[in-house]
Amino acid sequence: MNALLSNPFKEGLRKGDTQIGLWLSSTTSYMAEIAATSGYDWLLIDGEHAPNTVQDLYHQLQAIAPYASQPVIRPIEGSKALIKQVLDIGAQTLLIPMVDTAEQARQVVSATRYPPLGQRGVGASVARAARWGRIDNYMAQANESLCLLVQVESKVALENLDAILEVEGIDGVFIGPADLSASLGYPDNAGHPEVQRIIEACIYRIRAAGKAAGFLAVDPTMAQKCLAWGANFVAVGVDTMLYTEALDSRLAMFKSVQSVSTAKRSY
């Protein structure tokens, strides 16, 4: 089988295209396929905070596959064993949370690459990613088409950002606003002026280093700010949040507003 692996999301980052995404936290292939028909450039399947098993991730990758939206998987953490499983089920773009140091970044890079470039375990004959051994020269193609994104979301990570940006094999850095604002002493307040200043500066530093800069903004105004600051892959919503907002909005048409939650939501 002479199929060539491609990664349109990674190619878009290389070209500097702006790519708009959506967070998937509902854990179902049905919802993933609905989102995939909506036209988002990328869909983040969340395995960190949503209760997704590896098999759940697998089914959502299958559901998204026929459509143009590109899947990005965020595993619960960046261990070598878990990364191996997620790549074998067909993920080509990973977002690794809580990367605080350059050494952590190097370990993640190694876990995602086959030897001699890294330490990814070899098992193409049983992997969906290799079409069960039917893709010729799969290991070399996999190394080339992989897109690796890491999350900077703590004071420690901010201090080490320049070193993280120097790590070969990192394609982009994603700023985690919820954890970052909490780490900076502003829990549940990513809109605080000091947090905003730091986010803007980080985006500039990431792009200046030649890497892609990413962000999740459930507030459209914040999303527009990040795009203006130079972020080039931005998630503009979370499926579960959009669902609850729509449910509350519809109920408010028929019941008094006091009986419906009107609190402003943040991720």
From Swiss-Prot:
Belongs to the HpcH/HpaI aldolase family. KDR aldolase subfamily. NCBIfam families: PRK10128.1 (NF007521). Mg(2+) binds at E153, D179. Signal peptide: none annotated. One of its GO terms (cellular component) is cytoplasm. The gene is rhmA. The record marks R74 as: Transition state stabilizer. It comes from Salmonella dublin (strain CT_02021853). Homohexamer. The lineage of its organism: Bacteria, Pseudomonadati, Pseudomonadota, Gammaproteobacteria, Enterobacterales. Transmembrane segments: none annotated. This is 2-keto-3-deoxy-L-rhamnonate aldolase. Binds 1 Mg(2+) ion per subunit. The active site is at H49 (proton acceptor). One of its GO terms (molecular function) is 2-keto-3-deoxy-L-rhamnonate aldolase activity. It is an enzyme of class 4 (lyase). Keywords: Lyase, Magnesium, Metal-binding. It comes from the Bacteria. SUPFAM superfamilies: Phosphoenolpyruvate/pyruvate domain. The record marks D88 as: Increases basicity of active site His. Its cofactor is Mg(2+). PANTHER family: 2-KETO-3-DEOXY-L-RHAMNONATE ALDOLASE. Catalyzes the reversible retro-aldol cleavage of 2-keto-3-deoxy-L-rhamnonate (KDR) to pyruvate and lactaldehyde.
